[in-house]
């Protein structure tokens, strides 16, 4: 296999892939220097997905936008909620009865700040996440909010039985030293000069909302540092 050499390498492969690359690189011969904090302080942003069935009528989720917007549930503090439709799903070759049913459902989500007590490890060449929903009380609040939404609207709300996230964060966190973090304030990996992380793996805490802006701000900060002379 060929080799490429560079003074600086920026990892922005997404939280899961960045962790996988770091674990694999640290275990290969002549690879990365050890990272004691790798895999610690991992989170899922308390994402919980569900669906809300609306009453029959002219309205269809196929003619909605992917994101309709955020909303609050009275009496529930902490989580953020939002909903959206399924535009374009009706163009797929699905049975007519299934399309009629899906047209009545809205995509529903709740999310918030989880504790970061979860972790990730690399076992048998596979990245494994250790996440216990029971350690995150916010999930109970989100499920309770879904129940309130159903009782107040009179329309069924269904939540997935297990958390399902697209907002993983951490595992290669910003920290003050190698024992408490994987990257320093510049985004450079401790013990591995010239290696930088600019994605959600470096976040030291949950954002509690879609984290794209926070990740973009972090990447911009690291890029600014790389652009400086010296």
Feature roles, as predicted:
Residues 4-7, 12, 103-104, 151-152, ...:
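Short, well-ordered loop/turn elements at secondary-structure boundaries
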Residues 6, 35-142, 190, 197-204:
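FAD cofactor-binding and catalytic pocket of flavoenzymes
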């Amino acid at each position: 296999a060929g080799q490429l050499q560079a003074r600086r390498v920026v990892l922005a492969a997404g939280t899961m892939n960045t962790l996988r690359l770091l674990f694999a690189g640290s275990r290969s011969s002549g690879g990365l220097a050890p990272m004691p904090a790798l895999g610690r302080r991992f989170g899922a942003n308390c994402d919980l997905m569900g669906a809300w069935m609306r009453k029959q009528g002219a309205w269809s989720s196929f003619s909605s936008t992917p994101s309709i917007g955020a909303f609050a549930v009275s009496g529930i503090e902490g989580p953020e909620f939002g909903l959206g439709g399924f535009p374009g799903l009706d163009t797929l070759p699905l049975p007519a009865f299934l399309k009629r049913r899906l047209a009545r459902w809205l995509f529903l989500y709740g999310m918030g700040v989880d504790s970061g007590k979860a972790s990730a490890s690399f076992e048998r060449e596979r990245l494994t996440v250790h996440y216990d929903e029971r350690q995150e009380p916010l999930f109970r609040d989100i499920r309770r909010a879904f129940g309130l939404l159903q009782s107040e609207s009179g329309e069924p709300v269904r939540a997935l039985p297990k958390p399902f996230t697209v907002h993983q964060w951490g595992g290669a966190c910003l920290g003050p030293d190698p024992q408490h973090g994987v990257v320093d304030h510049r985004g450079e990996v401790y013990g591995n000069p010239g290696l930088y992380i600019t994605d959600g793996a470096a976040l030291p805490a949950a954002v509690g909302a879609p984290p794209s802006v926070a990740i973009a701000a972090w990447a911009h900060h690291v890029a600014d540092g790389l652009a400086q002379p010296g």
